[in-house]
C-alpha cells in the first residue's frame, strides 16, 4: 500500500477537515501490523480477551456478593447495600460486559464449559481449548483478587481480624451449597442451570432460529443470567461456570482461607461447580441438536445421511 499523499490530498483553502481526513490512507489492521507490538500481540488476543472477559465477570459478580453480604454487618455499613436481586444483577451485568468485551475477539465464551461444548459440537478448534480454559481460570483468579483487595477491610471487620478467615466469607467468592442439599441434588442443580444456559446460547447462535441482532447478545445474556439466578440460584449459588468458581476458590486458598475451601463436603468443588457444568453443557447441546439444530455441523443430522434408497 502506497502511504504517500497525492497533491489532491494536501490541505488547501478549499479543503475542509473532513475532506482531508477522508483522503488519509486506510490501513487494514486485519492483515497489516503497523508496529511490532501489534504483530506480537496478535497470537494472544483471543486468550487475553477471555482472560479479561472472565475477570470483568468476577469483578461485577463477586463484587456484588461482597457488597450485599458485607454491608449487612452494622460494623461495615449503617444499612444493607443491596438485596438478592442486586446480587443477581451483578452477575448478569458481569456476564453481559464480559461478553461485550471479548465477543468480537474470541467469541465471548468466558466459560470453560461453553468452550468445551463448542469444541465438541460446533467445530471450535481443539488446539485452542487448553489456552482458552487457562486464560479463563486465570481471569477468575485475578478478578477475585482485585475484589478481595477492594473489600479486605470489610472482610476483616466481619471475620474479626486480618488473620481470621472462615467459610462464611469464602462463600462470597466461590459457591457453597446449602446445608440441606444432598450431593446428588447439588449436582443436579448445577447441571440443570448450565444446560439451560447452553441451550439459550445455541438458540442465539442458530441462524435458522431467532438470533438477536448484532450487538444485542450481551443484553440477552443479561436477562438469561438474571433469570437463572432468580429461579435456580438459591441452593448452590449457580456457578454454571467452572472458571467462575474454581478461579476465586483458588484465590481464597492463596490469601489465607487454606485447604478448607477444597475440603468442603468431600471435594464439593470438583463434582458440583466444575464437573456438573461441563456435563450440563454437553447434554444441553445434545438436546438442542437432536430436536432443533439444522446446521451442517450437527452430528445427528449427518447420521445415516450417506444412505439413499432408490425406488424399485
Swiss-Prot record:
The chain crosses the membrane at residues 51-71, 90-110, 129-149, 184-204, 214-234, 268-288. Pfam families: MIP (PF00230). A motif (NPA 1) lies at residues 111-113. A motif (NPA 2) lies at residues 241-243. Residues 72-89, 150-183, 235-267 are extracellular. It catalyses: H2O(in) = H2O(out). CDD domains: MIP. PROSITE patterns: MIP. It comes from the Eukaryota. It is a multi-pass membrane protein. Glycans are attached at residue 183. It is found in: Membrane. One of its GO terms (cellular component) is plasma membrane. Induction: Expression is high in vegetative mycelia and highly up-regulated during development of the basidiocarp. Expression is positively correlated with root abscisic acid (ABA) content during ectomycorrhizal interaction with poplar trees. Its main location: membrane. Keywords: Glycoprotein, Membrane, Repeat, Transmembrane, Transmembrane helix, Transport. One of its GO terms (molecular function) is water channel activity. Residues 1-50, 111-128, 205-213, 289-312 are cytoplasmic. Aquaporins contain two tandem repeats each containing three membrane-spanning domains and a pore-forming loop with the signature motif Asn-Pro-Ala (NPA). Belongs to the MIP/aquaporin (TC 1.A.8) family. Water channel required to facilitate the transport of water across membranes. Does not mediate the transport carbon dioxide nor nitric oxide across the membrane. Plays a key role in root water transport of mycorrhizal plant such ectomycorrhizal white spruce or trembling aspen via the hydration at the hyphal-root interphase. Contributes in fungal cellular processes during the basidiocarp formation. This is Aquaporin-6.
Amino acid at each position: 500500500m502506497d502511504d504517500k499523499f497525492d497533491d489532491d490530498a494536501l490541505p488547501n483553502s478549499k479543503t475542509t477537515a473532513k475532506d482531508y481526513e477522508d483522503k488519509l490512507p486506510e490501513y487494514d489492521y486485519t492483515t497489516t501490523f503497523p508496529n511490532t507490538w501489534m504483530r506480537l500481540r496478535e497470537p494472544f488476543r483471543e486468550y487475553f480477551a477471555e482472560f479479561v472477559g472472565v475477570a470483568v465477570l468476577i469483578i461485577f459478580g463477586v463484587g456484588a456478593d461482597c457488597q450485599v453480604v458485607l454491608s449487612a454487618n452494622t460494623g461495615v455499613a449503617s444499612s444493607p447495600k443491596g438485596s438478592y436481586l442486586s446480587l443477581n444483577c451483578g452477575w448478569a451485568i458481569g456476564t453481559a460486559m464480559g461478553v461485550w468485551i471479548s465477543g468480537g475477539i474470541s467469541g465471548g465464551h468466558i466459560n470453560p464449559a461453553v468452550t468445551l461444548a463448542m469444541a465438541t459440537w460446533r467445530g471450535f478448534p481443539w488446539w485452542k481449548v487448553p489456552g482458552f480454559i487457562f486464560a479463563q481460570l486465570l481471569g477468575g483468579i485475578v478478578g477475585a483478587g482485585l475484589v478481595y483487595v477492594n473489600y479486605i477491610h470489610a472482610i476483616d471487620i466481619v471475620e474479626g481480624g486480618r488473620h481470621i478467615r472462615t467459610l462464611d466469607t469464602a462463600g462470597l467468592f466461590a459457591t457453597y451449597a446449602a446445608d440441606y442439599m444432598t450431593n446428588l441434588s447439588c449436582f443436579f442443580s448445577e447441571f440443570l442451570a448450565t444446560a439451560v444456559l447452553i441451550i439459550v446460547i445455541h438458540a442465539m447462535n442458530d441462524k435458522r432460529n431467532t438470533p438477536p441482532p448484532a450487538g444485542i447478545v450481551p443484553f440477552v445474556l443479561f436477562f438469561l443470567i438474571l433469570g437463572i439466578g432468580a429461579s435456580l440460584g438459591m441452593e448452590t449459588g449457580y456457578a454454571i461456570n467452572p472458571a467462575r468458581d474454581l478461579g476465586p476458590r483458588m484465590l481464597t486458598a492463596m490469601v489465607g482461607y487454606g485447604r478448607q475451601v477444597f475440603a468442603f463436603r468431600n471435594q464439593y468443588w470438583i463434582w458440583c461447580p466444575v464437573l456438573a457444568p461441563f456435563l450440563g453443557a454437553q447434554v444441553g447441546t445434545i438436546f438442542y441438536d437432536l430436536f432443533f439444530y439444522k446446521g451442517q455441523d450437527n452430528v445427528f443430522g449427518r447420521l445415516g445421511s450417506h444412505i439413499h434408497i432408490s425406488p424399485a
